[in-house]
UniProtKB/Swiss-Prot annotation:
Subunit structure: Has multiple subunits with at least A(3), B(3), C, D, E, F, H, I and proteolipid K(x).
UniProt name for this protein: A-type ATP synthase subunit A
EC numbers for this chain: 7.1.2.2
Gene Ontology terms, MF aspect: ATP binding; ATP hydrolysis activity; proton-transporting ATP synthase activity, rotational mechanism; proton-transporting ATPase activity, rotational mechanism
Length: 597
């Protein structure tokens, strides 16, 4: 029986209700006459402390609070992809239509207490059953059938985790809605109806058979990421950076061009116009791997800065639960959260309302454990059930440290749980070097794990060239200290060449225009050819210096070719890589003529 209490205190997004004996932690409740969605976060005696995921303006003591008897959950099934939700999985386009029916002038507002089913009830999906027969044993994760959800993704309809028994009936091929029963399983003498959709509590990670080592790179098309600081499928990463360093554009690039089959984009507490930009741009883009519309693989969760702060936490958990669901089907999923700092600020505000003892910079003492809960749900796994399949959830979170201070609590705690750190540098951004990822501060723990893939699929010398280029960039930063003191005249010719090659790496390889149709995405093969061209020229130059040629003579010999080398990244498409080799050969020939001529 549902618990029913009444409001005794209201403090912003926090509501205290009495008469709630029998309520459970994290139970979903309806608050007030408008039935606002809330979640119980603390119980003391018969009083429940509820964080409300909608505006509490106009609530008053004495209004009812009704429990649902279930935790905050999401609906999982066909129809998720291509949809935009708010922080508690309400479909915003449908809400806009509902509001417009009452008053067209209020179409742009989310009315308080408005409800809409997350999955479309009126849409039919074509269900094709698996070759199962009556009496077969089935368990959680087993595939019952498949539905072509979009042009890119085939949705696997699975037995919900925790259900095990004998298959009594399976629907034949045909068109069904998400509420239709598509199978009946006999479990302990009782019949369990399985619909095309299932519900899952957002705070509980979905189970899996086995966790696998993340050995496959997640190709993003961003050269500095894929070559120098690679992300693995099932990995965790953070993009910290101050104001204006390009966090959002970097995350948009990842969402647009990544090799992931499904992308979950969470706009958590950031500006509304950034989500609007995603909505305007994504439908126009094609998936680089298939040529199909990008929205066919994307779920957007919009919880912008002008929406209730409590829902920021819900949006993070809703997003990761949807990601785990597609992982269980055997897909590689990328979850992008922009930004986890806004979620942490929401935790700080609610902790203050709860009168909890503040820790560092006012954040609650459990900030680290909440961040860990989120990032630990990433990973590459062997999914439950049959047929056997593996999937992954890759999590990348933006961090917005005030003033670009990486020692603040959210950034410092995040670094404990992630293995890739793409540090955005204000100086690089202000000098118009984008992406502004600082190669001295950034790191990736996946370089050794993904090396084998690069060697087998691209070139066996990838690691050799990559490490050599990294050494040049590190050496250049040391030499810059000397140059500031005594100028370039105090350097020997080899060190001068290191400075020139480092400049070539930065201009011709690291800089990348996210809005250029050719330069926005570089295949692994193009990345390697560009790097190889620059490094082969560097090696040849060092040989010539040994023979007495000066750095100035080398640069003069290259002449206009220097510009061709820098421009190759945005003048040569991914399918014409032989032109990069032609530029390289012409450059090496010009250098050879310095000695032979």
């Amino acid at each position: 029986m549902a618990v029913k209490g009444s409001i005794v205190r209201i403090s912003g997004p926090l509501v205290v209700a009495e008469g709630m004996s029998g309520a459970q932690m994290y139970e979903m409740v309806y608050v007030g006459e408008d039935r606002l969605i809330g979640e119980i976060t603390r119980i003391r005696g018969d009083r429940a402390f509820i964080q409300v995921y909608e505006s509490t303006s106009g609530l008053k003591p004495g209004e009812p609070v009704v429990g649902t008897g279930a935790p905050l959950s999401v609906e999982l099934g066909p129809g998720l992809l291509g949809t935009i939700y708010d922080g508690v999985q309400r479909p915003l386009p449908i809400i806009a239509e509902k509001v417009a029916e009452v008053d067209p002038r209020r179409r742009m507002f989310v009315e308080r207490g408005i409800q809409a089913p997350p999955l479309p009830r009126d849409r039919k999906f074509h269900f094709k059953p698996e070759p199962l027969k009556e009496g077969d044993k089935v368990e959680g994760g087993d595939a019952l059938g498949r539905v072509p959800e979009t042009s890119l993704i085939e949705h696997v309809v699975m037995v919900p985790p925790g259900i095990r028994g004998r298959l009594k009936w399976l629907a034949s091929e045909g068109d069904y809605s998400v509420e239709d029963t598509i199978a009946v399983v006999e479990r302990d003498g009782r019949d369990v109806e399985i619909r095309m959709h299932q519900r899952w509590p957002v705070r509980i990670p979905r189970p899996f058979k086995e966790k696998l080592e993340p050995q496959l790179p997640l190709i993003t098309g961003v050269r500095i990421i894929d070559t120098f600081f690679p992300m693995a499928k099932g990995g965790t990463g953070a993009v910290p950076g101050g104001f204006g360093t390009g966090k959002t554009v970097t995350l948009h690039s990842l969402a647009q061009w990544s090799e992931a089959r499904v992308v979950i984009y969470i706009g958590c507490g950031e500006r509304g116009n950034e989500m609007t930009e995603v909505l305007e741009r994504f439908p126009q883009y094609k998936d680089p791997w298939t040529g199909k519309p990008l929205m066919d693989r994307t779920v957007l969760i919009a919880n912008t800065s002008n929406m209730p702060v409590a829902a920021r936490e819900a949006s993070i958990y809703v997003g990761i639960t949807i990601a785990e669901y597609y992982r269980d089907m055997g897909y590689d999923v990328l979850l992008v959260a922009d930004s986890t700092s806004r979620w942490a600020e929401a935790l700080r505000e609610i902790a203050g309302r709860l009168e909890e003892m503040p820790a560092e910079e006012g954040y609650p003492s459990y900030l680290a454990s909440r961040l860990a809960e989120f990032y630990e749900r990433a990973g590459r796994v062997k999914a439950l059930g049959s047929p056997e399949r593996s999937g992954s959830v890759t999590v990348v979170g933006a961090v917005s440290p005030p003033g670009g201070d990486f020692s603040e609590p959210v950034t410092s705690h995040t670094t404990r749980f992630i293995r890739v750190f793409w540090a955005l540098d204000t100086k690089l951004a202000y000098s118009r070097h984008y992406p502004a990822i600082n190669w001295l501060m950034s790191y990736s723990a996946y370089v050794d794990l993904v090396t084998q893939w690069w060697h087998e699929n691209v070139d066996k010398r990838w690691r050799e060239y990559r490490d050599e280029a990294m050494d040049i960039l590190l050496r250049e930063s040391e030499l810059q200290e000397i140059v500031r003191l005594v100028g370039t005249e105090g350097l020997d010719e080899k060190d001068k060449m290191v400075l020139e090659t480092a400049r070539l790496i930065k201009d011709g390889f690291l800089k990348q225009n996210a809005f250029d149709p050719i330069d926005a995405f570089a295949t692994p093969q193009k990345q390697f050819r560009l790097l190889k061209m620059i490094m082969d020229i560097h090696r040849k130059s060092l040989e010539l210096i040994e023979k007495g040629v000066t750095t100035q003579q080398i640069l003069q010999a290259l002449g206009r070719l220097y510009i061709d080398i820098v421009k190759a990244k945005f003048t040569i498409p991914n399918d014409q890589l032989e032109k990069i080799d032609e530029i390289r050969d012409r450059a090496l020939k010009a250098l050879d003529e310095l000695v032979s001529g």
